[in-house]
Amino acid sequence: TAATQAKGAETDGLAKLARIEMKVDTSYLSAEERQVVNLLNQAALLMSEIYKRQATPDYDRLRAEVAAKNDPKLLEKYDAFYGPWDPIEDNKPFFGNQPKPPGAGFYPADLTKDELDKYIAAHPDQKGALTSPYTVVQRQGDRLVAVPYSQAYKQWLEPAAKLLEQAAGITTNPSLKKFLTLRAKALRTDDYFESELAWMDLKDTPIEVAIGPYEVYTDNLYGRKTAFEAFVTLRDPKESQALDVYKSHLREMEANLPVEEKYKNFKRGFESPISVADQVHGGGDNVPGVQTIAFNLPNDE
């Protein structure tokens, strides 16, 4: 029947995803490192709670509507994709018929790029705040206002910051302690630069963690707003060492890129760490839909 076909269309996207158990060898971790990883896993879950609201306006209301349908497969798909749109099918809605707003949950659903451009032109003093990678744009009457992430998502960021501080208090690795301490501060202040530098300096620890607002792909309105995510990984020293041969040729690779000379950047740092790692836990932007197998962070912003 037509109803049966419609129901099947709502859930068949799950068939394209294979559920695979990823087994990571954690036997070599010390008791201290194990404690730190467990705390980071908890913080990663909070990044997911934030990203659900960034990806889907009215996330909680829509999920309640899906749950009321008493269709386990439909609810499973909603939870798998953090909303009613299928990213594998170019964000085609599988619940309801509303297209995904270009600005996702970063802007009012009815806000257009043209309206935002005109508003910024009329209020140039607000441009920095409205286009910041770390603010949510909301309507207040006829005005557009920028709400810092640290305020908009405080109910998740504050406990996440406390978890990072707790982990920092446990680890005896100086570089990891510094990064986690600074990252906790950044979650409360929206100033991530110092903690990004500390992240680049992580050393002498198997724990590689990236946590915070990074990529802007979810913002299809302005391409500015960063999405929260987390990668809790354990470095594979043997496979990472195998990449050292490529690190020694980074300058040559830059010189041989098939682009005009003006696009080649020889002022960049060529000592950037490159690692192979096993992911223990993901959070936020890297969880729904197709999984990330590599990342290049931090971004210049």
Q: Where are the regions that the model predicts?
A:
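Accessible peptide chain termini
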Residues: T1-A2, E301
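N-terminal intrinsically disordered, low-complexity regulatory regions
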Residues: Q54, D60-R63, A68-G169, K177, ...
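Fold-level signature of zinc-dependent metallopeptidase catalytic domains
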Residues: E10-L39, L46, K127-E301
